[in-house]
């Protein structure tokens, strides 16, 4: 729905990401991430990572969102080796087109 390259470019602008749902805020905190980290995940996405588009709400408003799944190898220090981690990201652009509303950012469960 949203041109991925445009969304990725927008992540480089300060203040352009908004964790839009309470659950998203909790999931991002659980990962030990901040909005810069979420922006980094979005910049790693490719068109092949696209999953689907769906309507999402935050309890007050609705947004048309694109959902992606990002798979990457990450070194887990406690285990001393790399594991394949799968992230699920769902986002929309705000009405102005200058704000990315992050609806979901969590690992697969």
PLM feature spans:
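Compact soluble domain cores
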Residues: 2-69
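Short, solvent-exposed aromatic-acidic interface loops
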Residues: 102-109
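Short, surface-exposed linear patches
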Residues: 41, 90-93, 109
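Functional cores of ribonucleases/endoribonucleases
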Residues: 48-97
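Short helix-capping/linker segments at secondary-structure and domain boundaries
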Residues: 35-36, 97-99
């Amino acid at each position: 729905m949203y041109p991925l390259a445009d969304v990725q470019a927008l992540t480089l602008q300060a203040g352009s990401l908004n964790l839009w749902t309470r659950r998203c805020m909790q999931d991002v905190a659980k990962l030990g991430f901040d909005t810069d980290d979420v922006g980094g995940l979005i910049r790693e996405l490719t068109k092949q990572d696209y999953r689907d588009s769906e309507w999402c709400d935050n309890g007050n408003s609705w947004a048309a969102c694109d959902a992606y799944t990002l798979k990457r190898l990450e070194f887990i220090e406690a285990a001393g080796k790399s594991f394949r981690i799968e992230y699920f990201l769902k986002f929309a652009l705000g009405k102005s087109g200058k704000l990315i509303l992050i609806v979901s950012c969590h690992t697969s469960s």
